[in-house]
């Protein structure tokens, strides 16, 4: 997810901005960057840290004292249920940060990594239809609700029906709105679900209800 289009500056613009801030009496505490969301490897973090280190060194040579570096977030979450090696991911980041003077305060903001596993969402089947060779189940939550990350973040949340058993059928889990894009999962094999049956979504603590709407009054 690109977060750099609307805000920020290029590394080449940073030092002139620091000089402009000093000329206007603005005290700059440090530098910050954000490499995006769900970054698969730490290469971008390392590149950004190295760029900030060069900017800070130039600023120090000119007598300016930026002493805080905020490396933002971007630490990924494994939505497939595997064990993500966060120590391995952070190793090159720690190595790059170690090249900064000890006086530089380092800040990280791993929001998704911390919050995503903290929430499990439970929805219920409010409608059912046989359409072609699939059974459609209409839930009371969907892509305009807590599953909106499938649109915004390209995330596929793990879903299950822990209380339903029996022969599996080709099915669709749909949200409740009129929009045809409001489909949580198409082609999922599920046992026969009754109205009121519960569907569980996991790893849903990040950017779910915070980005939800009330479209179609749901």
Region spans (language model):
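Phenylalanine-focused residue identity feature
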Residues: 7, 33, 75, 84, ...
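Alpha-helix termini
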Residues: 38, 43, 49, 76, ...
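Glycine-rich beta-strand-to-loop/alpha-helix junction loops that act as flexible
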Residues: 35-36, 69-79, 110-113
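Structural preference for beta-strand elements that scaffold enzyme active sites
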Residues: 6, 27-32, 66-70, 105-107, ...
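Active-site-proximal beta-alpha core segment in soluble small-molecule metabolic enzymes
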Residues: 1-68, 92, 96
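Active-site glycine- and acidic-residue-rich loops that bind
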Residues: 4-14, 38-50, 79-88, 112-118, ...
